[in-house]
C-alpha cells in the first residue's frame, strides 16, 4: 500500500492536494502497521500478556514481602495525582485523555520494539517482522505433507508446496549414478547428492546468494567441470559427519530450509532394469537411455532399509504425494524400499500420484496415465505387493500445440494422455488441472510449481471437506 501511494504521489508531480492526501494515507498506513501486532495468529500476544502478568505478580510478591507498604504508597500516589489533575480539568475530559495517552504509549513502544528487533535480526530483509511472523504462523498451521520422488519433478513440486506449509518432508531416491553425483559416488564413496541438493534449494527460504551458490555448477577447472558447489559441499559434509542424513541437516540450517529432506535409505543402492526383450541393464543412468520397454526394476542390495526419519514422516503425514518425476528412475526406486511401501499402505492420509506431462523416450514410450499406473502396479506386484498405495491421481488436462511441443515430438517424447473412464473403471479417483508452465516463460515442457501446488492443495482441501 505504501509503495503504491508513493508511486502515485510521484506520478502527479508532487501537487499540493495529492501530497496532502498521500501524507494522510501514509499516516493511516503507519497506524495500521502499528496495530497489526494485535492481529490473531502471531503466537506473540499471549507471551506478552504472560510477561505482563508476571511483572504484576512479581510486584505484588515484593509488596507482600515488604509488608504491603509499596502498594499503599502506589495507591496514595495515584489518588493524589488524580485529585491534583481533576482540580483543573473535569473527569469527563481528563479520563479519555489519559486513557488515549496510555494506549498511544503502548502502541508506540511495541511498534518501536518490533522495529528494533527486525533491524537486529534481519537488517537486510525488506519484509517487516510482523509480516514474517504472520507468514510463519500460517505455514506452521499447514498440513503435514510427505512428497516422494526425485529429479526435477520433485523439486518443482516442493517449490510450490513451501508456499502452503512448512511441515514438508521430501523423501528422495539415492540411486543416481550419472553426472556429478555419479563421479562423487564412485570416487568418494558417498551417496549421490544431486537430487537432495535440488530439493534443499527448492525448500530454501533463503532466496539469495546462498541458494544460488549451492546450485552453482563449475564450467572450468581441472576436476571441477560439471560439478555443482552443492554436490561438493554435501559430499564433504558427508565425509566429515559420517552419513548423508547428518550432512543434510547441517545444510538445511545453512539454507534456512522450510521442512526436511530425507534420503529413502542410507544403503549404497544400485539400480538394475529387466527389459521386455529379456536384456538386463545395470545403473540408473543406463536405464534412462534404454530403447526397449522396461518390464521391472530392482536394486542391490535387494531390500534396502529405510531411514527411521522417513518412516516417521510417513506415519505422521496428512497428505502423501508420489511424483511427478521419471517413472523408473525417480519414483519407483523409492518403492524398492519395503518399509516405505508398508508405511504408505498403513497411512490413513490421502495418497495422490502426479503423472508426468510428457513420456520419456525409451523409458515410458507410448504410456498414457493408465499405462504409468499399471507400470507402478506391476512393479509392486513383482515384489509381492498387491495392495494399492494410492487411490487418487492428478493429471494435466492437455499439452497445447506449440513449436516447443514439436521439438519434443521430434525427440521421441509425446504428451501423456489421460483416459478418465479407464482409470475410474479401475476404481481410481482422477483430478485434472492445467499444470503446465507457460510456453513463453519456459524452454522446456515442465510442471509449473504454482499451478501444481495449487492443484494439490485444492485436492487436499476437497478431501478434508468430504471426509
Where are these regions (language model features)?
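Electropositive, gly/pro-rich neighborhoods at or near active sites that engage anionic ligands
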Residues: 2-125, 175-291, 455-458
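Acidic, Ser/Thr-rich low-complexity segments on the non-lumenal side of membrane proteins
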Residues: 138-165
Amino acid at each position: 500500500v505504501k509503495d503504491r501511494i508513493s508511486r502515485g504521489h510521484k506520478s502527479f508531480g508532487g501537487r499540493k492536494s495529492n501530497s496532502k492526501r498521500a501524507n494522510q494515507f501514509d499516516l493511516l498506513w503507519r497506524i495500521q502497521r502499528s496495530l497489526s501486532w494485535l492481529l490473531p495468529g502471531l503466537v506473540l500476544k499471549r507471551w506478552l500478556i504472560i510477561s505482563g502478568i508476571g511483572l504484576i505478580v512479581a510486584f505484588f510478591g515484593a509488596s507482600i514481602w515488604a509488608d504491603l507498604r509499596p502498594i499503599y504508597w502506589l495507591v496514595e500516589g495515584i489518588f493524589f495525582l488524580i485529585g491534583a489533575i481533576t482540580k483543573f480539568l473535569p473527569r469527563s475530559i481528563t479520563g479519555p485523555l489519559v486513557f488515549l495517552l496510555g494506549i498511544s504509549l503502548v502502541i508506540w513502544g511495541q511498534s518501536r520494539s518490533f522495529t528494533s528487533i527486525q533491524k537486529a535480526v534481519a537488517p537486510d530483509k525488506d519484509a517487516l517482522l510482523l509480516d514474517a511472523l504472520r507468514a510463519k504462523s500460517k505455514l506452521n498451521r499447514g498440513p503435514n505433507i510427505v512428497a516422494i520422488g526425485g529429479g526435477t519433478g520433485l523439486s518443482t513440486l516442493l517449490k510450490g508446496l513451501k508456499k502452503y506449509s512448512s511441515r514438508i518432508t521430501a523423501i528422495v531416491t539415492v540411486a543416481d549414478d550419472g553426472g556429478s553425483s555419479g563421479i562423487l559416488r564412485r570416487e568418494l564413496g558417498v551417496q549421490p547428492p544431486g537430487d537432495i541438493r535440488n530439493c534443499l534449494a527448492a525448500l530454501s527460504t533463503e532466496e539469495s546468494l546462498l541458494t544460488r551458490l549451492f546450485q552453482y555448477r563449475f564450467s572450468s577447472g581441472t576436476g571441477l567441470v560439471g560439478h555443482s558447489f552443492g554436490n561438493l559441499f554435501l559430499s564433504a559434509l558427508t565425509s566429515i559427519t559420517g552419513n548423508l542424513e547428518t550432512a543434510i541437516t547441517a545444510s538445511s540450517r545453512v539454507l534456512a530450509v522450510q521442512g526436511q529432506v530425507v534420503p529413502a535409505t542410507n544403503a549404497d543402492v544400485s539400480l538394475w532394469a529387466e527389459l521386455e526383450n529379456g536384456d538386463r541393464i545395470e545403473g540408473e543412468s543406463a536405464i534412462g537411455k534404454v530403447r526397449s520397454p522396461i518390464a521391472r526394476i530392482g536394486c542391490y542390495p535387494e531390500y534396502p532399509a529405510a531411514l527411521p526419519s522417513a518412516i516417521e514422516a510417513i506415519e505422521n503425514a496428512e497428505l502423501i504425494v508420489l511424483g511427478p518425476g521419471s517413472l523408473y528412475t525417480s519414483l519407483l526406486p523409492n518403492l524398492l524400499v519395503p518399509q516405505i511401501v508398508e508405511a504408505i499402505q498403513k497411512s490413513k492420509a490421502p495418497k495422490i500420484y502426479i503423472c508426468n506431462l510428457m513420456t520419456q523416450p525409451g523409458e515410458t514410450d507410448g504410456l498414457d496415465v493408465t499405462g504409468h499406473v499399471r507400470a507402478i502396479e506391476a512393479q509392486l506386484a513383482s515384489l509381492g505387493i498387491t495392495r494399492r498405495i494410492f487411490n487418487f491421481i492428478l493429471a494435466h488436462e492437455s499439452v497445447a500445440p506449440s513449436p516447443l511441443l514439436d521439438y519434443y515430438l521430434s525427440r521421441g517424447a509425446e504428451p501423456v494422455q489421460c483416459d478418465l473412464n479407464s482409470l475410474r473403471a479401475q476404481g481410481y479417483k482422477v483430478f485434472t488441472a492445467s499444470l503446465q508452465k507457460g510456453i513463453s516463460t519456459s524452454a522446456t515442457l515442465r510442471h509449473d510449481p504454482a499451478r501444481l501446488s495449487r492443484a494439490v492443495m485444492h485436492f487436499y482441501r476437497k478431501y478434508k471437506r468430504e471426509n
